[in-house]
Amino acid sequence: MATTQPMGAVNPKTGMTHEEIREFVRNHFEEFVNRKNLGIGKVNFAPEFVDRGTDVPPGMPPGPEGAIAYVGGALKKFPDMRVEILDMVAEDDKVVVQNCWTGTEAATGKKYEFSGIVIWRIAHRQLVERWAYLTVPKLVA
Protein backbone atom coordinates (compact mmCIF):
# COMPACT_ATOMS: atom_id res chain seq x y z
CA MET A 1 0.00 0.00 0.00
CA ALA A 2 1.41 3.37 -1.02
CA THR A 3 2.01 5.95 1.64
CA THR A 4 2.08 9.67 1.14
CA GLN A 5 5.54 11.03 1.80
CA PRO A 6 5.75 14.62 3.06
CA MET A 7 7.20 17.06 0.51
CA GLY A 8 11.00 17.04 0.71
CA ALA A 9 11.16 14.09 3.13
CA VAL A 10 13.69 11.31 2.57
CA ASN A 11 12.06 7.92 2.07
CA PRO A 12 13.89 5.31 4.20
CA LYS A 13 13.33 2.67 1.47
CA THR A 14 15.03 4.68 -1.26
CA GLY A 15 17.32 6.97 0.71
CA MET A 16 16.03 9.84 -1.44
CA THR A 17 13.22 12.37 -1.70
CA HIS A 18 10.61 12.06 -4.46
CA GLU A 19 12.38 14.78 -6.43
CA GLU A 20 15.70 12.95 -6.06
CA ILE A 21 14.29 9.61 -7.27
CA ARG A 22 12.71 11.35 -10.27
CA GLU A 23 16.06 12.96 -11.09
CA PHE A 24 17.83 9.61 -10.56
CA VAL A 25 15.54 7.89 -13.09
CA ARG A 26 15.79 10.82 -15.52
CA ASN A 27 19.60 10.66 -15.34
CA HIS A 28 19.54 6.87 -15.72
CA PHE A 29 17.65 7.08 -19.02
CA GLU A 30 19.88 9.93 -20.24
CA GLU A 31 23.15 8.15 -19.44
CA PHE A 32 22.19 4.52 -20.12
CA VAL A 33 20.27 5.04 -23.37
CA ASN A 34 20.82 8.50 -24.84
CA ARG A 35 24.55 8.70 -24.06
CA LYS A 36 25.02 4.93 -24.55
CA ASN A 37 26.92 4.66 -21.26
CA LEU A 38 26.24 0.99 -20.48
CA GLY A 39 28.74 1.11 -17.62
CA ILE A 40 26.31 3.21 -15.58
CA GLY A 41 24.17 0.07 -15.34
CA LYS A 42 26.77 -1.47 -13.02
CA VAL A 43 26.24 1.49 -10.68
CA ASN A 44 22.49 2.06 -11.01
CA PHE A 45 21.19 -1.53 -11.01
CA ALA A 46 21.20 -3.35 -7.67
CA PRO A 47 22.85 -6.80 -7.70
CA GLU A 48 19.40 -8.32 -7.07
CA PHE A 49 17.76 -6.34 -9.91
CA VAL A 50 14.71 -8.07 -11.45
CA ASP A 51 13.33 -7.07 -14.85
CA ARG A 52 9.65 -7.94 -15.17
CA GLY A 53 9.16 -6.08 -18.46
CA THR A 54 6.99 -7.69 -21.12
CA ASP A 55 9.70 -6.68 -23.62
CA VAL A 56 12.51 -8.78 -22.10
CA PRO A 57 13.51 -11.61 -24.47
CA PRO A 58 13.56 -15.18 -23.12
CA GLY A 59 16.95 -16.37 -21.95
CA MET A 60 18.18 -12.94 -20.87
CA PRO A 61 20.52 -13.33 -17.88
CA PRO A 62 19.18 -12.13 -14.52
CA GLY A 63 20.38 -9.09 -12.64
CA PRO A 64 22.24 -6.07 -13.96
CA GLU A 65 24.02 -8.21 -16.58
CA GLY A 66 20.70 -8.98 -18.29
CA ALA A 67 19.58 -5.35 -18.35
CA ILE A 68 22.94 -4.23 -19.71
CA ALA A 69 22.93 -6.98 -22.37
CA TYR A 70 19.35 -6.15 -23.38
CA VAL A 71 19.99 -2.42 -23.86
CA GLY A 72 23.39 -3.13 -25.44
CA GLY A 73 21.69 -5.34 -28.03
CA ALA A 74 19.05 -2.70 -28.73
CA LEU A 75 21.77 -0.06 -29.20
CA LYS A 76 23.54 -2.29 -31.74
CA LYS A 77 20.31 -2.70 -33.69
CA PHE A 78 19.39 1.00 -33.32
CA PRO A 79 22.70 2.89 -32.85
CA ASP A 80 20.98 6.30 -32.71
CA MET A 81 18.29 5.16 -30.27
CA ARG A 82 16.95 7.89 -28.00
CA VAL A 83 14.37 7.99 -25.26
CA GLU A 84 12.31 11.04 -24.39
CA ILE A 85 10.52 11.22 -21.06
CA LEU A 86 7.00 12.57 -21.56
CA ASP A 87 5.75 12.32 -17.99
CA MET A 88 6.96 11.02 -14.64
CA VAL A 89 5.32 10.39 -11.27
CA ALA A 90 6.99 9.28 -8.03
CA GLU A 91 5.16 7.62 -5.14
CA ASP A 92 6.70 5.80 -2.19
CA ASP A 93 9.60 3.76 -3.64
CA LYS A 94 8.43 3.74 -7.27
CA VAL A 95 8.74 6.01 -10.28
CA VAL A 96 6.35 5.67 -13.23
CA VAL A 97 7.62 7.00 -16.55
CA GLN A 98 5.76 7.56 -19.82
CA ASN A 99 8.28 7.71 -22.63
CA CYS A 100 8.80 7.67 -26.38
CA TRP A 101 11.69 5.83 -28.03
CA THR A 102 13.07 6.47 -31.53
CA GLY A 103 15.85 4.84 -33.50
CA THR A 104 17.07 3.99 -36.97
CA GLU A 105 17.59 0.29 -37.63
CA ALA A 106 21.23 -0.18 -38.65
CA ALA A 107 20.50 -3.03 -41.08
CA THR A 108 17.75 -1.26 -43.05
CA GLY A 109 18.12 2.46 -42.41
CA LYS A 110 14.42 2.57 -41.42
CA LYS A 111 13.39 4.81 -38.54
CA TYR A 112 11.13 3.37 -35.85
CA GLU A 113 9.23 4.77 -32.88
CA PHE A 114 7.49 3.18 -29.93
CA SER A 115 6.19 4.36 -26.61
CA GLY A 116 5.70 2.82 -23.24
CA ILE A 117 5.16 2.97 -19.53
CA VAL A 118 8.04 1.91 -17.29
CA ILE A 119 7.74 1.45 -13.54
CA TRP A 120 10.94 1.41 -11.50
CA ARG A 121 11.25 0.36 -7.86
CA ILE A 122 14.16 1.91 -6.03
CA ALA A 123 15.88 0.80 -2.83
CA HIS A 124 19.00 2.22 -1.24
CA ARG A 125 19.71 4.51 -4.22
CA GLN A 126 19.60 1.71 -6.80
CA LEU A 127 17.10 0.28 -9.29
CA VAL A 128 15.86 -3.04 -7.92
CA GLU A 129 12.84 -3.83 -10.08
CA ARG A 130 11.40 -2.83 -13.46
CA TRP A 131 8.07 -3.36 -15.17
CA ALA A 132 7.66 -2.17 -18.76
CA TYR A 133 4.72 -2.13 -21.14
CA LEU A 134 5.69 -1.03 -24.64
CA THR A 135 3.83 -0.48 -27.90
CA VAL A 136 4.80 -2.33 -31.06
CA PRO A 137 7.46 -0.32 -32.92
CA LYS A 138 6.06 1.52 -35.94
CA LEU A 139 7.79 2.92 -39.00
CA VAL A 140 8.20 6.69 -39.00
CA ALA A 141 8.29 8.68 -42.24
Question: For the regions a protein language model found, what residue spans apply to each?
Answer:
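Domain-length accessory/inserted modules outside core catalytic folds
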Residues: 61-64
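Conserved class I S-adenosyl-L-methionine
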Residues: 46-48
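A beta-strand edge to alpha-helix "cap/lid" segment located at domain peripheries
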Residues: 2-20, 30-33, 37, 52, ...
